[in-house]
């Protein structure tokens, strides 16, 4: 079994910087140990003297010098009975390090990477299987991964999501069967109470609220958001039946920023901006600027995440002890409507999942090691760490221990002992990482949408399709983003909207739409 002892620094010394795989040779044929049950079926495995090498996109926890020092990796070896040799990228240069590793031909047994994310794996996983960098896992799962196989058979959507259009399984996935809406509108609840207003539901409610915040609460920044989050969620624009980018509408892929509803949305937002209801710095809003404005006490509403709330709540208490935040539903046009847009996280976004390389000498051992994390015990370990240390079972619920709860950073402490990317993400994983009840309530409210009906699934374009998308999509999006700001602040009249749409098509929008549709239909036929 290949030990993968060369470090990334050595690879850097022998390889030129690689940005594509042109000219790179494929790996060897996949190999497995003789026999079909060399290590038993229970954990820890009977694997004394055996070792697996892993390249992990997940960096070493910042508290430790090496992977071998991290409690999770130590415990993983103990529980599975498999010794591990673990390496990964340094300095956050994971894509560059991955490309260098692939180009070198010196591959570890297991590669934890963004295998379904086209920007990081151009041409998709089938290309890497064909060129013998990783192996198809169909037979491997049947032979040596009964726990993952059970999960796939019980969840048809998971089964569909984690294989290629040609039917190849390619990873042991990080999968989240129950997803949460991590982003949504937040309002100053104490201001609403002072003014006798309810949590806003409609666009009209929002206009009334923001106007009164400005006029009666002296808000100099009634509404703020980061443009990327607004466009990705359909915040406000969803009330007009649109969101910025590509989405599914009655089985067809459409581009929201080219449609009539987008013009209606821009018309209303231009009015709000002129009335001083949207922050004047909206075009250049970044996370730091947004935080400073929110905690200044002069902001009335923002589009934010549960994590932001966890940061802002204690900071605001120092500015104004009476300040209260509350999550609000995504705005609709008419009271009683259900928002069609919002944040919907894919159960399998294609990120941080484990492939077995074609250089692996012992596929059985690699598969059985990875399959541990789909056992009931393995899932608890991957999500919550070590029972009695980081969590305790209380009436069947894995409750985080006092050691974790009382630490300076709950998330960082858990991450020393648990790496959920190896497994099925337990919804209780996120529940306990939120400190304040406002966070939990907001996420529940934000999830009351039909965003999942419109969200594109994880699509796997071919290499040719990837080239087409790269050629046209950036120009289309860049132009649409520039015009969004111009229309919003009144620098461009909406009388030019038809010409703007024509320009989008000149830049290749129809080609992109046709390509998306082809890929989407392949996905449906998996």
How would you label these PLM feature ranges?
Residues 1-3:
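N-terminal secretory signal peptides that target proteins for export/translocation
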Residues 83-89, 280-281, 326-328:
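General small-molecule cofactor/ligand-binding pocket signal
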Residues 118-128, 306-319:
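A ligand-binding cleft/hinge motif common to bilobed small-molecule-binding domains
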Residues 6-9, 24-205, 234-235, 244, ...:
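Conserved N-terminal structural module of periplasmic/extracytoplasmic solute-binding proteins
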Residues 19-23:
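C-terminal motif of bacterial Sec signal peptides marking the signal peptidase cleavage site
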Residues 138, 164-231, 247-305, 354-365, ...:
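Helix-loop-helix "hinge/cap" segment bordering the ligand-binding cleft or interdomain interface
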Residues 58-71, 179-186, 191-199, 228-278, ...:
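Extracytoplasmic/periplasmic substrate-binding proteins
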Residues 368-486, 491:
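Conserved small-residue motifs centered on glycine
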């Amino acid at each position: 079994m290949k030990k993968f002892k060369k470090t990334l620094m050595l690879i850097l010394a022998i390889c030129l910087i690689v940005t594509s795989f042109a000219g790179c040779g494929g790996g060897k044929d996949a190999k497995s140990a003789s026999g079909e049950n060399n290590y038993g079926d229970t954990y820890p495995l009977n694997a004394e003297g055996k070792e697996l090498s892993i390249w992990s996109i997940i960096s070493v926890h910042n508290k430790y010098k090496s992977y071998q020092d991290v409690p999770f990796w130590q415990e993983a070896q103990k529980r599975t009975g498999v010794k591990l040799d673990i390496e990964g990228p340094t300095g956050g240069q994971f894509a560059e390090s991955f490309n260098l590793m692939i180009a070198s031909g010196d591959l570890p047994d297991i590669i934890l990477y963004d295998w379904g994310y086209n920007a990081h794996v151009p041409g998709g996983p089938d290309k890497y299987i064909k060129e013998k960098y990783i192996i198809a896992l169909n037979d491997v799962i049947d032979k040596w991964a009964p726990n993952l196989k059970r999960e796939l058979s019980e969840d048809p959507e998971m089964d569909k999501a984690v294989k290629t259009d040609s039917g190849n399984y390619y990873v042991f996935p990080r999968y989240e069967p129950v997803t949460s809406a991590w982003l949504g509108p937040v309002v100053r609840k104490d201001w609403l109470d002072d003014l006798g207003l309810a949590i806003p539901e409609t666009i009209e409610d929002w206009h009334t609220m923001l106007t009164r915040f400005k006029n009666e609460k002296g808000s100099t920044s009634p509404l703020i958001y980061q443009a990327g989050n607004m466009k990705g969620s359909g915040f406000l624009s969803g009330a007009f039946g649109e969101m910025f980018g590509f989405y599914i509408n009655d089985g067809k892929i459409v581009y929201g920023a080219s449609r009539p509803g987008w013009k209606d949305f821009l018309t209303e937002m231009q009015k709000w901006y002129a009335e001083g209801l949207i922050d004047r710095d909206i075009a250049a809003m970044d996370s730091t600027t947004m935080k400073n404005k929110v905690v200044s006490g002069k902001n009335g509403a923002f589009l934010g995440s549960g994590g932001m709330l966890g940061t802002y709540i204690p900071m605001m208490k120092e500015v104004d002890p009476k300040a209260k935040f509350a999550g609000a539903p995504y705005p609709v046009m008419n009271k009683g409507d259900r928002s069609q847009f919002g944040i919907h996280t894919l159960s399998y976004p294609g990120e941080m999942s484990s492939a077995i390389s074609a250089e692996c000498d012992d596929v059985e051992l690699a598969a059985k090691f990875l399959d541990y994390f789909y056992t009931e015990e393995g899932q608890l370990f991957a999500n919550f760490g070590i029972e009695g240390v980081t969590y305790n079972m209380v009436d069947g619920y894995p409750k985080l221990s006092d050691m974790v709860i009382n630490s300076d950073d709950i998330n960082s402490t858990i991450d020393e002992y648990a790496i959920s990317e190896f497994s099925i993400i337990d919804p209780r994983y996120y529940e306990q990482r939120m400190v304040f009840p406002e966070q939990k309530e907001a996420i529940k409210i934000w999830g009351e949408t039909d965003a999942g009906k419109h969200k594109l699934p994880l699509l796997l374009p071919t290499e040719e399709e990837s080239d087409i998308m790269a050629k046209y999509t950036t120009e289309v999006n860049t132009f649409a983003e520039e015009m969004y700001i111009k229309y919003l602040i009144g620098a461009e009249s909406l009388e030019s909207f038809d010409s703007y749409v024509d320009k989008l098509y000149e830049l290749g929008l129809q080609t992109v739409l046709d390509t998306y549709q082809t890929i989407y239909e392949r996905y449906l036929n998996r």
